[in-house]
Amino acid sequence: MGASQSTNGPGQKTTSVEELSKRLAYRFANKCFTPLELTHLKDNFFSRALDQGGIRYWNEEILSEFLGIPDGAGSAAYVTSDGSLDAGPVIFRMVSYLGAFPFQNTMAPSVLTFEAMVKVIVLLTERYGKVLRRGRKDRVKLLYGSLADVGRRDIIVQLQEAAEDSMESVGEAGPGSDRTFTHSTGFSVDKPAHDDDGEEDDDDLALAALESLDAIEIFKHDQRIDKTVYESKISINTFRRLLALLMVTAPLRPLGTISKYTTGLSSSILETVHEQVESILAALALDDLEGGIGYKSFSELISTSLPYLFDPLTPLFEHLLFSKNLDLTRKRHSQSQNDPAAKPVPTPPSTPPSSPPLSPVILNGGFDSSILNPALLSHLSFFLSTSAQIPNIFRNRTRLHPVFSSTEHGESLTSFSHHVMTWQAPSILLIKGAVTSESDEEQITTIGAYLPQPWKQSSSYSSRRSSDVPDQSTLPCLFELSPVHTVLQGSPSLSSLKPNMPVTYFSTKTGIAIGCQIPPPSRKSLGADFLPKPSGGGSLLIDPALEVATLVISDGLNGEGVFLPPGISAHSASKSVSCTTLAASTTSISASNHNTTKSISIYSLEVWGIIPSQSLSAQLDSPGSFVDKQDAITQQRAQWDFEAREAERRKVINMKVGVGELEEHSGRALLEMAGIVGDSQYSGLRHLR
């Protein structure tokens, strides 16, 4: 204990946790913000900050009012009568925890000072990648700790219990300072704190940020004090309020008006929001719903099926980086006052500068959706990726084009083929229907699939080396949006699947099959042997009449297949085992795994075409890319025009085999049956791979 306790010995120095936290905040500010952003942040913070004993800080009311978040009190209180969007207390608890980073175990809840606010903005926006060593994984741990509010012991008790064990290894605090520790300047930052990679191993969470501050030993001390953060849980009510806020603010654009999404919501809109929120909560285990959400369940849910859930926090907290009070023309205005002939400089508007809308625009034309609504679109944005550069569909300015609706175009495979097979771009298939339980009660269900390749006969996935980690936006996805949120990611071994396992299969005899094994064509194939068979982690079959859809989800893998089972992401699958090995290993898994089969009476079936923004199209326009130089809508219309001209040309064929009108109609009937003219020209076998 001798030398390590001395604060005056050679090679020793004393640094408080508070001082290190401030120094780290300044490092964050210099690394993650521009000088202009810092100027705006300082103006926003100090113009509203309270002062107590020389400490400038924000309280919950100031934070909620600035962000426009309902908090059950103040000006943002009267947003909804049921208070379901009153997430102000939840957000304030999160920022109070994150403001103490990386010493949240000894300092949290922290006072929301300017330094704390700097760290909060970095950690709650996409700037976190510059300071967290393991990026998204570390951020999930921090977010869980900031939300956990059930079963957490009092921090003072934890400090007292840890004091005796930590005294010798860290150094006893000097008189009058309960958070001052000593450590050697020659401490090796490469020395591991733990050898295991367990979920509770957070010791390297912020080592990269602290190495240059010579604060590694203090950080390790802080981490040893409270490993019980993973023993605490997130209450269902806390997570429900946060989900509701994220659901309504998902389309929020940078510098957009937050109140537009949180105020004036009708009861019908709130009902759709609650439906999607409860669907996500239903994906958790029953034990989580009763006693709170544990870290393992939270981490698995976010990493495997809701990777973009917290994306709305980025534009929300980046509002702090724009101040309405700053007038950059003020200096020029003061100089012009001495010149009588100079025109007065107009005052800037009180609202932030406008920016292009970022919500996926549902293009007009075709039909009005009976499935899509703002809440469901937000739900899709939490897990659906349409671009490698900017995965979130709200951020990358994806546009949705109405391609097919069974309500508008009829429940016919001929009509489906005419509208869908001519769409040369990615698409989303949505189905809304009812599942009848054993008690004859109908439960409304919404399922769908993301198909990154066009529906066309000659389509196939581009060749990919098995060592390559596939981009999520290039893999298909099968999902259930309600009543239980379920996501089945595309397999990273997709390129190595056999030809009889196409992503999508279309036949006028068997209907539509997604993620199924297709039996070889044979005249002897009758009954069940002729139908596509479910494979992999899940499959979807739709009958030729577009009346019944069968969703099959497997607990394991029914051999190799297009989709992975629920709870497994393509990234983790490709990381744990190579694509070739994964495909080979799945064949050894018994096909007797328990399958959950849902027979859904279809109320409505819709196909929506995905059109990337023009800027992303330029980036993605490369060999093997789905983006063509010609707009997908223009391509489809050109195809329809060509088919119409061909139909007109065929009409001039002399169908008069006799001299009477009856013979003319008979001749035309023969041509229609042959598929040369009429609607039947769209029938036949279509095979998508």
From Swiss-Prot:
InterPro entries given in the database record: TLDc_dom
Keywords from the named record: Cytoplasm
Domain of life: Eukaryota
Entry GO CC: cytoplasm
Keyword Transmembrane: no
Residues of the TLDc domain: 370-611
Location of the region described as Disordered in the Swiss-Prot/TrEMBL record: 166-201, 332-359
UniProt biased composition (Pro residues): 343-359
Keyword Cytoplasm among record annotations: yes
Subcellular location: Cytoplasm
Function: May be involved in a process influencing telomere capping.
Family classification: Belongs to the RTC5 family.
Record protein name field: Restriction of telomere capping protein 5
Encoding gene (name): RTC5
